[in-house]
């Protein structure tokens, strides 16, 4: 067969030619495209090319497993391929969940939480006991505010027949335990439900919005006899196109991005290194917001510069408050500047000590434990609130 005949026979397989050219082109693009260390869309670290030294150190199978993962993570157009897959699955297959995230009405996303994990069943009693101990050691000073999940406030937007965890029984038990131990439980479920027609939770993220946090803050002020932060007297700033943690898992093609709102405040934040219990050192002073984070994927990290072990906010009020928190408090704390002169913020993920020495040195007027219910059931570090001495 001459060359002309071979060429003519190949033309009978146009699909084969197209696919061959496609994969050759994709391979070439992979070769010339720089590897990425991090995927902002997925909020995850990407695999890097395994060193040839691993071949002899770990064996052929282990090396090729690592190399296959590297190729998968670094494929050209990875974000676009993931979005295409999501579009096909949600549009053609009518999927109601993706990546462990339930796709609800009004473009809301919910974590697929059908019950407490076995680890959470062990952690929840420990954290409850720790907070009870804190209430008993500082009677009349401890306030506990647990933010309910968005699914608890917007059950009508959860996909039909999804048997999500009912938090109410647990929250009722926690309320009773806190009050019996001499603390105050600030139950915000009713307040948030009353305002559910407003933008209280992000659609694509697991946090509440600054507005949701504000309504919870107002209820705390009512309980403590404080005048709330006046939002009308301050300039509200916004950042659009926020895709949060739920989106990073679900990666739906038609997700509606969120908007972050914060208030332009001149108050200062000092972030400390802590080398011993209650002994902060090497403070770095900055503003309340890390606006550089608005240019990256995790925009919510702008509030309080993320989850620092110990930081102090300079307020405009009087007295001192200690906030023991998860990231739900990050957009809540700025409102407290209207009420207190000093707002100390502890995040046990990065604070490896108990609280008694810090409290003894600072003499707080109030203590606020602010977590989401989800974090309260799973945080392996909150037990430190119950450590005495």
Give residue ranges: language-model regions.
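Extracellular glycan-modifying ectodomains
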Residues: 1-389
